[in-house]
């Protein structure tokens, strides 16, 4: 297979291993009920301010292999974003890039190399965080799409590529463009393990409306499907006598779906439909109870379905009417909702390491409100607006926000197809029913790109309805280890205890430290975990100091600076010694 090479590839291939592990410093919690609070909400929702490379590393102890869905919207590298390469890679060529704004095409001849060097270690960490049946989505355009695909093939494996979604982000051309006016972006989709993924979107009312029950079948509503197929199979070529007496044969170049014997079985089971007058070419009844729980997604998503860039800007303007926001291409919440719906799990953990305006969190909250789910979000944002914009938007989504003006809502949407054209009268009747709803000052029909929608417009003056929910805000703290690989005591002993306990058990340390059991972390799975550590002196595990063990267990794992116990002695008593700091696991 072709390989992707770039300046610095060999230097960044394992750079994610060199990134220091930092603790997360909790700054505050926020909930719909209490507002801002000093206590941790324990909601599982997190917003982290800091470099996403270090933040992703900090998430590994708790979330490695546990994230259900990842969505990222990295810099497109158009030359306009003014992003800066800041990864401290030990290489002379790369060190020259540090702190430099990446320039435009034709001005900066290493711009694509810088982008690939920036993305590669982050994608490696994202891959480690993703669950075995997890989904990965990345927004991109043509500037780097051609480089992103082979890079993701390296990390995920080309066999785990699912598809490239085309999102229609603009609804009108930019006439000042010299050649083409691009009106789409891509959303690249990969699985951690394709064999464990089943992509389905929730069934829509429009899809379900295609089912009916004209013959009152006890099995419920159904729709008819074609009884002829191709290519021709000889045993499936035979004449059929309809209930009306008319004789029909398959269309030219096709045959019937079933053999004559199986056709009779379907008749006996009342699964063949000849139309209301018994004179239609036979079709097979497909019951809604027998179809998949969701719908197979298509790869072209129009702005009428999921919104466009101007919709996204309007959303942000509603939330921050007096602010000039540093975003040219935010993503509409509807787009994120559809992406997240592909991971058909109401309890999914969702990660966005390029959080921007916080659209991903807003989409998670909307979905939870809509279906009663308990999805969690983790957002990471490097820039200083992580608090003022990203977190502030999530606060407003949770509690509602002041708004004065008209708000449009898609009440119902239909595909323009033969089935819906036949029931156009029913659509008009539904439109009239919505017009009776006093909530909406105006209800109209709007058509666009093969869809027709009933739009309700309401005037809101005051506070919008919030989604409810809560989150915790964190800053990236100090690294657990100093450059010399000794423990960094600045982070505090409790953070070190939590880190060690998690590396050993994959569990959170809930047990509080008390004076009588100073060195005990906790007991888990019949093993007692001890961190025999003193800030001012070395600790030695010996017969004289075994009194640090304060609770009986089947096995004991003890961290200390030194050990004087013989191996045979420890084996006889099921004691495992680990040296500080050498044996503390690094992520």
Predicted regions, residues:
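Signature of N6-adenine DNA methyltransferases within the class I
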Residues: 119, 132-133, 142-200, 387
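Glycine-rich adenosyl-nucleotide cofactor-binding module
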Residues: 37-61, 310-349, 366
């Amino acid at each position: 297979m072709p390989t992707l090479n770039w300046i610095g590839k060999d230097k960044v291939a394992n750079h994610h291993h060199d990134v220091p592990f930092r603790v997360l410093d909790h700054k505050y919690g926020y909930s719909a009920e209490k507002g801002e609070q000093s206590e941790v909400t324990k909601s599982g929702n997190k917003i982290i301010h800091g470099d996403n490379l270090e933040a992703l590393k900090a998430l590994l102890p708790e979330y490695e292999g546990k994230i259900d869905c990842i969505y990222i919207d990295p810099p497109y590298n158009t030359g306009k974003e003014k992003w800066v390469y800041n990864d401290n890679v030990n290489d002379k060529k790369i060190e020259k890039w540090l702190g430099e704004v990446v320039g435009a095409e034709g001005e900066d001849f290493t711009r694509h190399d810088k982008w690939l060097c920036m993305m590669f270690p982050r994608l490696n960490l994202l891959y480690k965080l993703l669950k075995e049946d997890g989904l990965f989505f990345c927004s991109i355009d043509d500037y780097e799409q051609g480089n992103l695909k082979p890079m993701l093939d390296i990390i995920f494996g080309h066999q785990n590529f699912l598809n490239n979604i085309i999102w229609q982000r603009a609804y009108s051309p930019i006439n000042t463009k010299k050649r083409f006016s691009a009106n789409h972006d891509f959303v690249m989709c990969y699985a951690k393990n394709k064999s464990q993924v089943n992509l389905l979107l929730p069934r829509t009312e429009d899809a379900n409306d295609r089912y009916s029950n004209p013959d009152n079948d006890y099995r419920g509503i159904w729709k008819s499907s074609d009884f002829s197929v191709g290519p021709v199979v000889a045993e499936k070529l035979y004449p059929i006598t309809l209930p009306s007496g008319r004789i029909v044969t398959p269309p030219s170049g096709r045959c019937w779906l079933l053999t004559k014997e199986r056709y009779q079985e379907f008749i006996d089971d009342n699964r063949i439909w000849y139309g209301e007058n018994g004179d239609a070419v036979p079709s097979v009844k497909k019951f809604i109870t027998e179809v998949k729980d969701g719908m197979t997604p298509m790869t072209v998503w129009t702005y009428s379905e999921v919104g466009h860039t101007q919709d996204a800007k309007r959303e942000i303007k509603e939330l921050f009417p007096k602010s000039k926001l540093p975003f040219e291409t935010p993503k509409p919440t509807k787009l994120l909702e559809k992406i997240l719906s592909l991971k058909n799990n109401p309890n999914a953990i969702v990660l966005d390491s390029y959080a921007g305006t916080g659209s991903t969190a807003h989409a998670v909250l909307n979905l939870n409100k809509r279906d009663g789910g308990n999805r969690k979000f983790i957002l990471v944002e490097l820039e200083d607006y992580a608090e003022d914009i990203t977190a502030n938007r999530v606060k407003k989504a949770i509690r509602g926000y002041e708004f004065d003006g008209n708000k449009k809502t898609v009440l119902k949407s239909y595909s323009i197809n033969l089935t819906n054209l036949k029931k156009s009268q029913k659509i008009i009747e539904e439109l009239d029913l919505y017009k009776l709803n006093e909530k909406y000052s105006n209800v109209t029909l709007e058509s666009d790109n093969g869809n027709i929608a009933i739009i309700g417009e309401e005037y809101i003056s005051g506070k919008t309805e919030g989604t409810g929910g809560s989150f915790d805000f964190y800053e990236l703290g100090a690294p657990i280890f100093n450059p010399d690989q000794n423990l960094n005591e600045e982070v505090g002993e409790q953070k070190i205890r939590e880190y060690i306990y998690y590396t050993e058990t994959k569990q959170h340390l809930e047990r509080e430290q008390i004076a009588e059991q100073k060195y005990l972390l906790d007991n888990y799975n019949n093993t007692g975990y001890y961190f025999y550590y003193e800030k001012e002196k070395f600790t030695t595990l010996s017969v004289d100091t075994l009194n640090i063990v304060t609770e009986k267990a089947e096995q004991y794992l003890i961290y200390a600076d030194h050990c004087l116990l013989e191996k045979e002695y420890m084996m006889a008593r099921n004691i495992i010694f680990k040296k500080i700091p050498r044996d503390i696991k690094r992520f």
